[in-house]
C-alpha cells in the first residue's frame, strides 16, 4: 500500500496521564529548512487557543531503515518550529507528546474511559506541503473502536489503522472519537447518518433518537434542496459526549462534535427530560444546518482559513444567527415540537435580546467582527456592551422572513434566499463577500 508523503500517527500512549504521542513523517522535507506550525485556533470557534501550549515534548529525527539521527529544531514563535538542517532526500520524523484533558468539542481529551481529538490539536502543519494528500494512522487501544468520517484506507474492524484526507485543511475537518459507543444508524433522504454516544450510563432509546433525528435532518435537506432532496455529503456523523453538565457543539463538513447533559437524552427506564431533550434536538439541528451554512456557504474571509491569526468577518450574524433561527424552526417543521413550544423559544430569544443594554451599543456586524475579543472573552461587562450575533441574528432572520412573505404574498420566503445562497455560493464554493448577502 502506497501512502502519501505526509503521514501522522496518533497513539493514545498514556491514558492516566492524558497524553497522546504523535509522529509526523515527512517523506520530502524542504532541504533549505522545513517549517512546522501548530494551529492557533479551530474553525467554528473564534478564539485564539494556542494549541501549541499542550505540546510537552517535541523532537525531530532523520530516519532510514537502519538508523536515525536527531535533528536540531529551532523555535521561531509560539506556534512555529524550523528544522535547521535537512539532508536532500532524507525522511524526517517529528515526534510530539501532547497533553489532552479538555472535555470541550474544540480540542482533545484522553483518559481511561474515552479519547477524542480534533487533528488541529495534535497535528503540526508542514509548510509548503499542506496542499498534499495526508494520511492519519490511529494505533489500536484495547477493546476500543474509532469513530470518524475520514476516508478509510486500511483499517481493522474496530477502525484502527490508516485514514486519508485530500490535504491538511481537510484533515482538520474530521474529529476523531475513541472508546466504546452506543450507536444509532438511519438514512435521511437516502444518505447514511449515524449518532455515536459516549458517557451515557443507561441504554439510550435508539428508536426515538433515530425517528426524531431522521425527521429533522430530512427537513433541513429539503430546506436547501427542495427539488433534488439530496445532502451534500456521502454520510454524516454526530459524535456525542454525554456528561453530568455541559452543552456545546462544533460544526464540520460531514460531522459534528456535541456535548450534552446525559439526562437530556431519552433513556430506557428513565423519565424523559422534555425541555432538555428539546434543547438537545435543537443543538443537533443547529450543527447539522452548518454543514450547508458556514462549511460550504462561507464568508470569503474564510477562504482559505489562516489558522495562525484571527480571521475577521462581519457576517457571523448571518452564518450563526440565521442558523439559530432555522434550528428551532426545523424542529417545528419536522413536527418534533408543537407550535406553542416553538413560539416560547422565539419569545425567550426575543426577551434575551431586549434585556441586553449591549444592543444599543453594538451592531450585529460589529459583534461579528469583535467575536474574537468580546463575545468569546465575555466578562461581567459584556451584557452592557455586546449584542449576541446568534440571538439578534436570529431575530433579523425572523423579521426578514416575515417581510419577504408579506411583500410576496407568501410566494417567497427566507427559504428562497437560503436556496439561492446554496446555489450561488454553496455548490460553487464561491466565498460570500462582506456585502454579498445584501446583493442577494
Regions found by a protein language model. Name each.
Residues 1-41:
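Early extracytoplasmic/domain-onset interaction patches
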Residues 48-57, 64-215, 219-231, 245-246, ...:
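Non-catalytic architectural context of zinc metalloproteases
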Residues 182-316:
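Juxtacatalytic substrate-recognition/specificity segment
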Amino acid at each position: 500500500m502506497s501512502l502519501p508523503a505526509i503521514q501522522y500517527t496518533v497513539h493514545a500512549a498514556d491514558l492516566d496521564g492524558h497524553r497522546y504521542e504523535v509522529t509526523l513523517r515527512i517523506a520530502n522535507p524542504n532541504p533549505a529548512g522545513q517549517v512546522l506550525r501548530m494551529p492557533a485556533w479551530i474553525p467554528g470557534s473564534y478564539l485564539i487557543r494556542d494549541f501549541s501550549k499542550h505540546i510537552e515534548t517535541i523532537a525531530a529525527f532523520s530516519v532510514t531503515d537502519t538508523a536515525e539521527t536527531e535533528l536540531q529544531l529551532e523555535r521561531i514563535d509560539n506556534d512555529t518550529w524550523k528544522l535547521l538542517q535537512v539532508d536532500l532526500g532524507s525522511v524526517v520524523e517529528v515526534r510530539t507528546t501532547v497533553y489532552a484533558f479538555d472535555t470541550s468539542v474544540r480540542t482533545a481529551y484522553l483518559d481511561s474511559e474515552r479519547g477524542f481529538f480534533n487533528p488541529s490539536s495534535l497535528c503540526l502543519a508542514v509548510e509548503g506541503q499542506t496542499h498534499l494528500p495526508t494520511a492519519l494512522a490511529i494505533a489500536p487501544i484495547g477493546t476500543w473502536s474509532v469513530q470518524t468520517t475520514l476516508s478509510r484506507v486500511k483499517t481493522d474492524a474496530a477502525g484502527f489503522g490508516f485514514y486519508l484526507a485530500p490535504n491538511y485543511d481537510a484533515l482538520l475537518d474530521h474529529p476523531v472519537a475513541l472508546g466504546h459507543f452506543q450507536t444509532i444508524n438511519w438514512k435521511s433522504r437516502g444518505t447514511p447518518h449515524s449518532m455515536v454516544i459516549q458517557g451515557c450510563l443507561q441504554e439510550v432509546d435508539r428508536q426515538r433518537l433515530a425517528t426524531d433525528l431522521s425527521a429533522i435532518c430530512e427537513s433541513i435537506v429539503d430546506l436547501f434542496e427542495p427539488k433534488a432532496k439530496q445532502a451534500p455529503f456521502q454520510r454524516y456523523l454526530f459524535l456525542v459526549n454525554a456528561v453530568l453538565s455541559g452543552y456545546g457543539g462544533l460544526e464540520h463538513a460531514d460531522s459534528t462534535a456535541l456535548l450534552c447533559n446525559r439526562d437530556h437524552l431519552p433513556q430506557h427506564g428513565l423519565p424523559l427530560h422534555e425541555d432538555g431533550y428539546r434543547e438537545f434536538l435543537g443543538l443537533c439541528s443547529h450543527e447539522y444546518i452548518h454543514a450547508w451554512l458556514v462549511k460550504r456557504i462561507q464568508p470569503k474571509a474564510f477562504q482559505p482559513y489562516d489558522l495562525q491569526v484571527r480571521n475577521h468577518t462581519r457576517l457571523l450574524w448571518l452564518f450563526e444567527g440565521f442558523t439559530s433561527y432555522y434550528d428551532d424552526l426545523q424542529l417545528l417543521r419536522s413536527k418534533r415540537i408543537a407550535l406553542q413550544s416553538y413560539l416560547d423559544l422565539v419569545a425567550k430569544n426575543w426577551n434575551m435580546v431586549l434585556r441586553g443594554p449591549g444592543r444599543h451599543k453594538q451592531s450585529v456586524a460589529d459583534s461579528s467582527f469583535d467575536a474574537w475579543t468580546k463575545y468569546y472573552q465575555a466578562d461581567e461587562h459584556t451584557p452592557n456592551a455586546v449584542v449576541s450575533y446568534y440571538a439578534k441574528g436570529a431575530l433579523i432572520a425572523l423579521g426578514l422572513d416575515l417581510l419577504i412573505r408579506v411583500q410576496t404574498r407568501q410566494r417567497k420566503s427566507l427559504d428562497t434566499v437560503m436556496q439561492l445562497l446554496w446555489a450561488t455560493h454553496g455548490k460553487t464554493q464561491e466565498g460570500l463577500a462582506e456585502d454579498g448577502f445584501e446583493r442577494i
